[in-house]
Amino acid sequence: MARITVEDCLKQIPNRFELALAATYRARQLAQGHTPKIESRDKPTVVALREIASGHVGVEMLKKVPV
């Protein structure tokens, strides 16, 4: 199993706070049944981080958050 580190994700989203918000929002989407953008059997939080590290999901996640 490949490990996901914060450093891998920081290459895509340099701000740690924005990274945490984007990962949280995407993990919630996945937990609610949205289709993952990568193939994985991991939990939603890990899938969200993998999507960010691979570049499939980025800061644009934060623009979709309802206020």
UniProtKB/Swiss-Prot annotation:
It holds the Pfam family RNA_pol_Rpb6. It catalyses: RNA(n) + a ribonucleoside 5'-triphosphate = RNA(n+1) + diphosphate. Its EC number is 2.7.7.6. Signal peptide: none annotated. It comes from the Bacteria. Transmembrane segments: none annotated. SUPFAM superfamilies: RPB6/omega subunit-like. GO terms for biological process: DNA-templated transcription. One of its GO terms (molecular function) is DNA-directed RNA polymerase activity. GO terms for cellular component: DNA-directed RNA polymerase complex. It is an enzyme of class 2 (transferase). Keywords: DNA-directed RNA polymerase, Nucleotidyltransferase, Transcription, Transferase. Gene3D superfamilies: 3.90.940.10. PANTHER family: DNA-DIRECTED RNA POLYMERASE SUBUNIT OMEGA. HAMAP family: RNApol_bact_RpoZ. The RNAP catalytic core consists of 2 alpha, 1 beta, 1 beta' and 1 omega subunit. When a sigma factor is associated with the core the holoenzyme is formed, which can initiate transcription. Promotes RNA polymerase assembly. Latches the N- and C-terminal regions of the beta' subunit thereby facilitating its interaction with the beta and alpha subunits. Belongs to the RNA polymerase subunit omega family. This is DNA-directed RNA polymerase subunit omega.
